[in-house]
Design a protein with these regions (language model features):
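Flexible loop/turn segments at secondary-structure boundaries
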Residues: 16, 63, 87, 145-147, ...
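Single conserved hydrophobic/aromatic residue that forms the stacking wall/gate
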Residues: 352-361
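Conserved anion/nucleotide-ligand pocket segment
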Residues: 127-156, 160, 295-316
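Long, internal scaffold/assembly segments composed of regular secondary structure
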Residues: 198-276
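Flexible, glycine/charged-enriched surface loops at secondary-structure junctions
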Residues: 168, 225, 232, 279-286
Length: 361
C-alpha cells in the first residue's frame, strides 16, 4: 500500500493530542487509500527522497515556523489545509511567500473527493519522477547540426531529474555491425517483411543491413544498460549505407525508448511519458500546419511496429536509402508533447484527434 508522509506544522497553542481529532475527516479519507504517517516538522530530515511528502498546515500561526525551514521543505511544496484551526489562511500566506521566491507551491483544500483525486495525481507524478532517477540515455554519435534549439545540459538534467546522458561513439556500433552476418538476421527480416501490408521501396539487401544495425545497437544497449537512446542517424548513413529507422522502431517495440537525429530533448520526452503513463510514444516532425482548419500533418519513420495497425516498408525520405516504417495508426484521440529547455524544465502539451491515419508521400 502507498504511503504519504504528512509533515505537520501546528501552533504551540494547540495541543498535539488534539491534532488527530481536529482533522479526523481529512485524515480518515486519506487512510482509505494510503498509509498516512504524521511526521513532526522537526523530524522531516529523517525522511528520504523516495518518501512522498505533503506539508500539513494543521493550524494557523505557523507561517514564520514554516519559512524558517524553507531550505528543508519538499519541492514542489504541496500544502494540505482542510480549513480547521485557521489553517487555510496560514497556507495562503505561506504559499504566497514561497511563490514570491520562485518556489512552486500548491494548496490542497476543498471537498474531500477533489483533494483525494488531486493527491492521486500528485502521487503518480512523484512515483514517475522517482522512477526516472538513475535511468541512462545513450547518445550514439552527436546531435544533428540543425537541432539548434534542442540542446540539453547533461549536468543540469542529472541534477533536476536524476537521468544520465551517456555519450557513445558510433564506432562501437560499426564494430558490432561488421560482426553480425546476414544469416544471423535472415529469419527476423522474413518476419518483418511477411507482416508488412506492402513494401513500396527497399530491397532485401537493405532490409538485411537495417536488421544487422538493429542487432548492433541492441548489443550496445545491453552493454551500457540503456533505458533509452538517441541515434545520430545521418552520420551513420555515410559510413554503412543504411538508416537507423527500422532499428529504432524495433527497439521501441523492445521497450527501449529510441529516437533519431541525436535529439536530446525528444528522447527525454519519450522516457518521461513512459514513466508517467506506461504508454509508448514515437518521434515525429511537424510537416504542415493549417491554423484555419486546426490541422497538423506529422511525418515519422521510427514508429514501433506494435503501435501501428498495419505498416508499409519504405525507404528513408531524405536520402532514399535503407528502410523506414510508414505506420498506419488507428483513428482516435492522442496527446502530443515535447519537453524542452537546457535543463528540461519546460514542456508543450496538446490533445489531438487522428482523423486520417496515413498519407503517403
Amino acid at each position: 500500500i502507498m504511503t504519504i508522509h504528512l509533515i505537520s506544522f501546528a501552533s504551540l497553542l494547540h495541543k498535539q493530542a488534539t491534532l488527530r481529532s481536529s482533522h479526523e475527516a481529512i485524515l480518515s479519507e486519506l487512510e482509505k487509500y494510503y498509509t498516512v504517517k504524521l511526521v513532526d516538522y522537526q523530524d522531516m530530515d529523517k525522511l528520504t527522497s523516495d518518501d512522498f511528502k505533503i506539508i500539513f498546515i494543521a493550524t494557523g500561526g505557523v507561517e514564520r515556523l514554516v519559512i524558517q525551514h524553507f531550505e528543508r521543505l519538499p519541492r514542489p511544496a504541496i500544502l494540505l489545509a482542510d480549513g480547521m484551526q485557521n489553517s487555510l489562511a496560514a497556507a495562503l500566506e505561506i504559499s504566497t511567500w514561497l511563490r514570491g521566491r520562485g518556489m512552486k507551491s500548491e494548496i490542497l483544500h476543498g471537498e474531500l473527493p477533489a483533494i483525494i483525486q488531486r493527491v492521486h495525481i500528485l502521487y503518480n507524478n512523484f512515483r514517475a519522477q522517482r522512477s526516472l532517477f538513475g535511468k541512462r540515455i545513450g547518445v550514439i554519435g552527436t546531435p544533428s547540426s540543425w537541432l539548434v534549439a534542442s540542446n540539453v545540459d547533461y549536468l543540469l538534467a542529472k541534477r533536476r531529474w536524476g537521468i544520465e546522458y551517456i555519450d557513445i561513439p558510433l564506432e562501437r556500433i560499426y564494430e558490432h555491425f561488421q560482426q553480425i552476418t546476414d544469416e544471423q538476421v535472415g529469419a527476423s527480416c522474413a518476419a518483418v517483411a511477411s507482416q508488412a501490408l506492402a513494401c513500396r521501396e527497399g530491397t532485401p539487401e537493405d532490409l538485411i543491413k537495417a536488421m544487422r544495425l538493429y542487432r548492433a545497437i541492441k548489443k550496445v544497449c545491453e552493454e551500457e544498460k540503456l533505458e533509452a537512446l538517441t541515434l545520430s542517424c545521418f552520420k551513420l548513413i555515410e559510413q554503412i549505407d543504411t538508416t537507423g529507422c527500422l532499428a529504432l522502431s524495433l527497439l521501441n517495440d523492445d521497450g527501449i525508448m529510441a529516437g533519431c537525429e541525436g535529439d536530446l530533448q525528444s528522447i527525454f520526452t519519450l522516457l518521461a511519458v513512459k514513466s508517467l503513463t506506461g504508454k509508448d510514444g514515437f518521434m515525429a516532425n511537424p510537416s504542415m500546419i493549417n491554423s484555419r482548419t486546426n490541422e497538423l500533418i506529422l511525418a515519422h519513420c521510427t514508429i514501433g511496429l506494435k503501435q501501428t495497425e498495419r505498416y508499409i516498408i519504405r525507404n528513408h525520405f531524405e536520402t532514399e536509402k535503407g528502410i523506414a516504417i510508414q505506420g498506419l495508426l488507428p483513428t482516435g484521440d492522442v496527446t502530443i508533447i515535447k519537453c524542452g529547455g537546457e535543463c528540461l524544465d519546460e514542456y508543450y502539451l496538446s490533445l489531438m484527434h487522428i482523423s486520417e491515419p496515413t498519407r503517403p508521400y
